[in-house]
């Protein structure tokens, strides 16, 4: 399948600066607080979107991008934190699926009974795993496995408005969701794209 209009997202400048510099006939378009850079690469129309950080920003930026530019496909990419010991800095995770690691139900407790996050249970939103597009997944797998020098993993992206730094918590999340890494945007993008029926995929390079 040929994609003529491709929207590529990143939350921060460091995730999109290189891509912006590759654009020919570049045009910057600002909508609300969200920046889009339209141009061409290899005769394809490419839109680079700075989504800003977080699931809500990613959802808004994706909705704007779809409405304004009518992309054939959306690629969400950027950095992520590893959730498995065999995944290291510089490795890449391709998001075959994406899940919400920040949506829980909690047991009822009275005052002074304390709190224990390990007792929290994923709620129905967390269990609604979002899938990447099969054709995109196949294409990305072929390109990265052929050309990338570090390890490439395929699996579930964990995503939510949380920055986990506690190893026991990270291990619990990994055991609960089976995710390979965590970021703060993917779930908003996957959910929005699936609602609009726009093919999408997430690609994350491990930064920590």
Language model region names:
Residues 2-63, 69:
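N-terminal short beta-loop-beta anion/metal-coordinating cradle
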Residues 12, 81, 98, 158-162, ...:
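Glycine-rich beta-alpha junction loops
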Residues 32-34, 53, 97-100, 205-208:
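Short, acidic/turn-prone active-site loops that include or flank metal/cofactor-
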Residues 46-51, 154-158, 203:
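Active-site-proximal beta-strand elements of phosphoester/diester hydrolases
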Residues 70-75:
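Proline-aspartate-enriched helix->loop->beta-strand connector
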Residues 84-177:
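Mid-sequence, gly/pro-rich, charge-dense loop/helix-turn segments that line enzyme active sites
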Residues 162-208:
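A C-terminal functional module that forms or caps the active site or interfaces directly
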């Amino acid at each position: 399948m040929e994609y003529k209009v491709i929207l590529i997202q990143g939350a921060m400048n460091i995730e999109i600066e290189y891509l912006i510099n590759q654009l020919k006939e570049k045009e910057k378009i600002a909508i609300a607080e969200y920046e889009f850079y339209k141009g061409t690469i290899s005769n394809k129309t490419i839109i680079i979107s700075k989504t800003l950080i977080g699931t809500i920003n990613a959802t808004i930026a994706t909705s704007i991008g779809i409405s304004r530019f009518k992309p054939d496909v959306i690629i969400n990419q950027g950095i992520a934190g590893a959730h498995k010991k065999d995944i290291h800095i510089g490795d890449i995770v391709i998001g075959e699926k994406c899940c919400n690691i920040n949506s829980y139900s909690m047991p009822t407790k009275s005052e002074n009974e304390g709190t224990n996050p390990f007792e929290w249970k994923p709620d129905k939103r967390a269990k609604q795993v979002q899938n990447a597009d099969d054709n995109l997944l196949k294409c990305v797998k072929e390109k990265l496995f052929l050309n990338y020098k570090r390890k490439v993993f395929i699996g579930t992206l964990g995503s939510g408005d949380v920055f986990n730094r506690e190893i026991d918590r990270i291990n619990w999340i990994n055991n609960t969701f089976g995710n390979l890494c965590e970021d703060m945007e993917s779930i908003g993008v996957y959910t929005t794209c699936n609602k609009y029926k726009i093919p999408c995929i997430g690609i994350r390079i491990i930064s920590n």
